[in-house]
């Protein structure tokens, strides 16, 4: 006890006195209950079966038993401190409580009581003095479970108020009683909250029974046979009384409140509702948010700055947590719904939103789309090399975006962005300081020929500058030269396009443009400036004949043939990486003597000897 400093006495109860104390270590205010009975060993203390369990009970409407101390044969219980009890709260009132306040108080009492009963305890001494509170917003049950073990036989005059809340079976000296006696006490306390005076203010045990009979009426033997047996064993005869309607005594109570009190104040303990059942009564099924308000935290802190933080408040009404904003709300204004992200997935224009089908349906009804960006059929060549928004190389290379922090915006719009490509942003940011081809887009005027009518609905965040401004910049050319996979001796400007005179459908690359494919669905393709009109926006942009590096495959020993990746290849075969290096993309090897290969012929690689790779033949002759 030398760890606590006693400050003043708070009260003197039946079984001990309560002192206000302060922890010397933390400065926290506590309530110290010093038991009147002496305990000469710890075994006697531990024989109080509640002592161990009470320390484990933790509920927002139950006073926490912090510590049990035995010193000089005296037993001390250290509780958390509350500034007042419900009796003081009612005594200081000069007008009746609103029913909403009473409902809130009652709900908290029943919440704590249901918790106690659930863990095998019942209070045995429920009364307003044992309901500690911080105003009407927070109520906690105190001193439960101690009464039975610490019960002495004091004169009833020592603590008169306890009698007013005793159940009839206790008054009739029943040897078997349980948690229903607490429910009876709660019903009496509820009536007192409405009236601000006790419902059964008996002056003795016999008078208490008379007071109960005056309100509830004389019980019938058929209604409570056990009660008549108890009365006969005490040579007691119930007075003959006519019941009084509780509504007459408590006019300010609602019909639901009268019904709940009538059920809890039943002569037969078996017919009383449990605390859990009482919580489900229609009296509590209202729109009111029950439970302690947030203000009680501030009031408790203002009372004692060092006071221990309150335990979590009870969820008296199962308040449904506010759901996270729907993903639909987050993508409002986006050109298309976000699907499962796949690397290098073609982007559909916003106008195709109404006819866009799920991926499974596309695979059933249409050939697999190419990894190239969507190309509009018969798109006319733009003057001055300007592009529509469907230029693919910008998306794949991620070289244009609105601002440095708009990466998430681009990902939300699903402009070819995938999780596997995010690391490339760090590489881009490092290179921007030296030779940055990136330029922030400017808003496109409504009357500009920058885009056709079909992509006018695109958000301003996707507005891009014309290609002529980007492709002619020296830094851009240097950057793309570094990023591309040009090989010595291969001039991509001299290659031609296969089937250049055929019409292009963005969904039928595999069967209209390339009747004879080298792979299962794919084909090879080379670009030239002379073919710009035939290939629409992509070839117009690709003036240098550059083939995007992620669509290349190096074939045979020295990359002598440049092939496009198979159109049906899985995305996992093409790991996104902006750094240049050889052997980056692995895939099947194609026959270099196949038809329709209008690429500069090179010498065939020297076959390996005995399964070993001839590195000189592979690299030495071309580097």
Swiss-Prot record:
Phosphotyrosine carried by residues: 159
CDD domains: STKc_MAK_like
Region of interest called Disordered, as start-end residue ranges on this chain: 328-396, 416-469
GO cellular component terms, semicolon-separated: axoneme; centrosome; ciliary basal body; cilium; cytoplasm; cytosol; midbody; mitotic spindle
Catalysed reaction, written as an equation: L-seryl-[protein] + ATP = O-phospho-L-seryl-[protein] + ADP + H(+); L-threonyl-[protein] + ATP = O-phospho-L-threonyl-[protein] + ADP + H(+)
Pfam families xref list: Pkinase
GO molecular function per UniProt: ATP binding; metal ion binding; protein kinase activity; protein serine kinase activity; protein serine/threonine kinase activity; transcription coactivator activity
Quaternary context: Interacts with RP1. Interacts with AR and CDK20. Found in a complex containing MAK, AR and NCOA3. Interacts with FZR1 (via WD repeats).
Effect of residue 130 to H: In RP62; results in a complete loss of kinase activity compared to wild-type
Tissue expression remark: Expressed in prostate cancer cell lines at generally higher levels than in normal prostate epithelial cell lines. Isoform 1 is expressed in kidney, testis, lung, trachea, and retina. Isoform 2 is retina-specific where it is expressed in rod and cone photoreceptors.
Residues annotated as domain Protein kinase: 4-284
Species this chain originates from: Homo sapiens
Family of this protein: Belongs to the protein kinase superfamily. CMGC Ser/Thr protein kinase family. CDC2/CDKX subfamily.
Role this protein plays: Essential for the regulation of ciliary length and required for the long-term survival of photoreceptors. Phosphorylates FZR1 in a cell cycle-dependent manner. Plays a role in the transcriptional coactivation of AR. Could play an important function in spermatogenesis. May play a role in chromosomal stability in prostate cancer cells.
Protein name: Serine/threonine-protein kinase MAK
Domain of life: Eukaryota
PTM text: Autophosphorylated. Phosphorylated on serine and threonine residues.
């Amino acid at each position: 006890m030398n760890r606590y400093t006693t400050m003043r006495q708070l009260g003197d109860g039946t079984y001990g006195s309560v002192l206000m104390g302060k922890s010397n270590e933390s400065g926290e205010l506590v309530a110290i209950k010093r038991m009147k009975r002496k305990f000469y060993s710890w075994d006697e203390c531990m024989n109080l079966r509640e002592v161990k369990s009470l320390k484990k009970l933790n509920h927002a409407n139950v006073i926490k038993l912090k510590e049990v101390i035995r010193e000089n044969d005296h037993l001390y219980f250290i509780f958390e401190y509350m500034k007042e009890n419900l009796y003081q709260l009612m005594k200081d009132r000069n007008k009746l409580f609103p029913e909403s306040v009473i409902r809130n108080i009652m709900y908290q009492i029943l919440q704590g009581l249901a918790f106690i009963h659930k863990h095998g305890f019942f209070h045995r001494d429920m009364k307003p003095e044992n309901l500690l509170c911080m105003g009407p917003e927070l109520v906690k049950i105190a001193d439960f479970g101690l009464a039975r073990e610490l019960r002495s036989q004091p004169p009833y005059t020592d603590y008169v108020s306890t009698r007013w809340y005793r159940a009839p079976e206790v008054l009739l000296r029943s040897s078997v009683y349980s948690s229903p006696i607490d429910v009876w006490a709660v019903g009496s306390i509820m009536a007192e909250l409405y009236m601000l005076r006790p419902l059964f203010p008996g002056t003795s045990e016999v008078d208490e029974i008379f007071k109960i009979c005056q309100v509830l009426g004389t019980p019938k033997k058929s209604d409570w046979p056990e009660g008549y047996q108890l009365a006969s064993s005490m040579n007691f005869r119930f007075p003959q009384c006519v019941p009084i309607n509780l509504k007459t005594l408590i006019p300010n109570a609602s019909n639901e409140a009268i019904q709940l009190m009538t059920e809890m104040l039943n002569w037969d303990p078996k017919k009383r509702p449990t605390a859990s059942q009482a919580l489900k009564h229609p009296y509590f099924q209202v729109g009111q948010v029950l439970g302690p308000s947030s203000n009680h935290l501030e009031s408790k802190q203002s009372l004692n700055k060092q006071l221990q933080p309150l335990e979590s408040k009870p969820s008296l009404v199962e308040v449904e947590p506010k759901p996270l904003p729907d993903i639909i709300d987050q993508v409002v204004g986006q050109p298309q719904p976000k699907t499962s992200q796949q690397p290098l997935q073609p982007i559909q224009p916003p106008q195709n939103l109404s006819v866009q089908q799920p991926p499974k349906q596309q695979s059933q009804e249409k050939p697999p789309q190419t990894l190239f960006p969507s190309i509009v059929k018969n798109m006319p060549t733009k003057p001055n090399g300007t592009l529509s928004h469907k230029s693919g190389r910008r998306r794949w290379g991620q070289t244009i975006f609105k601002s440095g922090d708009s990466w998430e915006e681009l990902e939300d719009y699903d402009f070819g962005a995938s999780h596997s490509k995010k690391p490339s942003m760090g590489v881009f940011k490092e290179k921007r300081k030296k030779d940055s081809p990136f330029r922030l887009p400017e808003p496109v005027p409504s009357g500009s020929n920058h885009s056709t009518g079909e992509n006018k609905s695109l958000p301003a965040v996707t507005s891009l500058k014309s290609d002529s401004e980007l492709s002619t910049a020296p830094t851009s050319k240097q950057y793309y030269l570094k990023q591309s996979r040009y090989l010595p001796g291969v001039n991509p400007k001299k290659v031609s396009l296969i089937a250049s005179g055929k019409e292009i459908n963005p969904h039928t690359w595999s069967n209209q443009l390339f009747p004879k494919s080298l792979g299962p669905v794919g084909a090879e393709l080379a670009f030239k400036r002379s073919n710009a009109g035939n290939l629409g926006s992509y070839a117009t942009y690709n003036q240098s004949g550059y083939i995007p590096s992620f669509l290349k495959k190096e074939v045979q020993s020295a990359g002598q043939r440049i092939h496009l990746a198979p159109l049906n290849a899985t995305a996992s075969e093409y790991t996104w990486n902006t750094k240049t290096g050889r052997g980056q993309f692995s895939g099947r090897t194609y026959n270099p003597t196949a038809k329709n290969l209008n690429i500069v012929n090179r010498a065939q690689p020297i076959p390996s000897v005995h399964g070993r790779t001839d590195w000189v033949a592979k690299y030495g002759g071309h580097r």
